[in-house]
């Protein structure tokens, strides 16, 4: 399988959304950029902020859509077209209600699971054949409480667990960038097994 050329963090722009559960994807690419000493700059034709980094000898783009979560696909598809990147060479990092904080999972293809950034991207692409990094934020217990939950900030313990999951994912990223997704999945899923209970 081809390696990665684009990593997209899904989230909402603006300081009021910083470090909310819904912005776990933004946090992931922010940490990647910080570790690489790269800075995000606004790219208006791509409707988002971009940075270029190198992992495992491969240069790749980071993207944070500035469209708000529900319209993320506009930015993602513009970037794929502009940089001539296949969807299979892209990884979308996003918050995942169905996983506890401290857990991260890699996945290829599948549905959107109610995640609006994925939903919009899949609608515009016409399929879901791209890689996803699902960063667990936990579930509030009832669907009526989901919106305030995702738009709120996690408590100290959950926030630290989300940070650990992001670090775990970054540790296996060189394998994914090189195209060895099976090994990356195996290592990531082993490294944070039972994370929800630590």
Annotate each predicted stretch with a short phrase.
Residues 1-109, 119-133, 140-145, 152, ...:
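Nucleotide and nucleotide-moiety/phosphate-recognizing core
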């Amino acid at each position: 399988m081809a390696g990665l050329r684009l990593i997209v963090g899904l989230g909402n722009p603006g300081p009021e959304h910083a470090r909310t559960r819904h912005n776990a994807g933004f946090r992931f690419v922010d940490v990647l950029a910080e570790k690489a000493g790269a800075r995000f700059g606004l790219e208006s034709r791509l409707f988002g902020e971009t940075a270029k980094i190198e992992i495992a000898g491969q240069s790749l783009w980071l993207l944070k859509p500035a469209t708000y979560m529900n319209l993320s696909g506009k930015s993602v598809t513009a970037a794929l077209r502009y940089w001539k990147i296949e969807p299979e060479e892209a990884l979308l990092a996003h918050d995942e209600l169905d996983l506890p904080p401290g857990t991260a999972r890699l996945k290829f293809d599948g549905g959107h699971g109610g995640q609006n950034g994925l939903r919009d991207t899949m609608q515009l692409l016409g399929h879901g054949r791209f890689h996803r990094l699902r960063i667990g934020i936990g579930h509030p217990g009832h669907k009526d409480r989901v919106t305030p939950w995702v738009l709120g900030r996690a408590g100290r313990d959950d926030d630290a667990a989300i940070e650990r999951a992001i670090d775990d994912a970054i540790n296996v990223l060189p394998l994914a960038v090189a195209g060895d997704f099976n090994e990356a999945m195996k290592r990531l899923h082993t490294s944070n097994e039972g994370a929800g209970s630590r």
